[in-house]
Every structure is written in structure tokens, then in C-alpha cells.
């Protein structure tokens, strides 16, 4: 818990700085898209995460690897920002900074992230129904969906938006029925 608090205190100002640059350059969405890709890469490449977070590895080596990972088509603001994190010895906070950037960008654009668990993969029309329902419930302009399949739900969906959970699953209905029969 303590590490998480320290991490968020460090991440917040860096994320705000990147957001400010993205806003002033009109690249809020472009940088956000690259950050999502970067977070996905870090999630799927634990060796890369360990490499950039290792304090023993020299900054120049980290910069070289990050430049190679980002490629020549990467947004220069994001690439320069990551090099700044290396220079300031804050690169180990890259993931929390990126997460905080996305959170701040969502607030700025009145966007909500809806984490949807369903028994089977949702098709496009089902996703649109969920998006419309979340917009109605939250008043958001835009809804980002993060979907995952959870076979234990039996049927239906569970939607998590921030700290709110909307359980429209068969498993949830059975649990509520079980509680009412006690």
C-alpha cells in the first residue's frame, strides 16, 4: 500500500505534464493511443518491464532499448518524455505515469472506462448496447470498453465503472436469490 501511494504521488505530476504537452500540441488522442499500446506491451513483456525498472542498468542502455521499442514512427513527445523519465531516474514509474495519463485524459474528455465481464465474447451490437447503457448510467460522452470472458458468470454481464459494479449476470442473480431464501 505504501509503495502504491508513493508511486501515485510521483506519477501524478509527470502524467499532468505529459497531458499538458499533449493538449497544447493537439495530440491528446494520439499520445493516449500510443500509451495504451505501450501499457499492453509492458503487460505482455515482463522482461522489458524488469529491464527498464532495474536500477543497475545504465541510462544509455535503457534509452537505446526504449528508442528501439518505440520505433521511428512513435510520437516524438512521448519518446522524449520517456527519455526524460530515464534521465530523472523515474523510468520505473512508467506504468503508473501512463495509467495516470489515461485517467486524467478520460476526466478531461468526459470518458469512462467500463470493464465488462461476460460469459462469452460480446459481438459488436452487444458492445454497443453496453456502451449506450453505461452512457445513460454515467452521463459520459464516450465509453471505453475493456472486455474479458468469465465462464463462471453462466450468462449475462458484469460491468464495472470506477467503483460502481452493475451485475446483470446469471451467477449474480443466483447469489441474490440464494441470499433472499436464507
Curated annotation (Swiss-Prot):
Q: Which Pfam families match?
A: OSCP
User: What's the source species for this entry?
Assistant: Microcystis aeruginosa (strain NIES-843 / IAM M-2473)
Put simply, this protein is called ATP synthase subunit delta
GO cellular component terms attached to this protein's record: plasma membrane-derived thylakoid membrane; proton-transporting ATP synthase complex
The entry assigns this protein to a family as follows:
Belongs to the ATPase delta chain family.
A GO term for molecular function: proton-transporting ATP synthase activity, rotational mechanism
Membrane-topology descriptor: Peripheral membrane protein
SUPFAM superfamilies from the xrefs?
N-terminal domain of the delta subunit of the F1F0-ATP synthase
Which locations, inside or outside the cell, does it occupy? Cellular thylakoid membrane
In UniProt terms, what function does this protein have?
F(1)F(0) ATP synthase produces ATP from ADP in the presence of a proton or sodium gradient. F-type ATPases consist of two structural domains, F(1) containing the extramembraneous catalytic core and F(0) containing the membrane proton channel, linked together by a central stalk and a peripheral stalk. During catalysis, ATP synthesis in the catalytic domain of F(1) is coupled via a rotary mechanism of the central stalk subunits to proton translocation. This protein is part of the stalk that links CF(0) to CF(1). It either transmits conformational changes from CF(0) to CF(1) or is implicated in proton conduction.
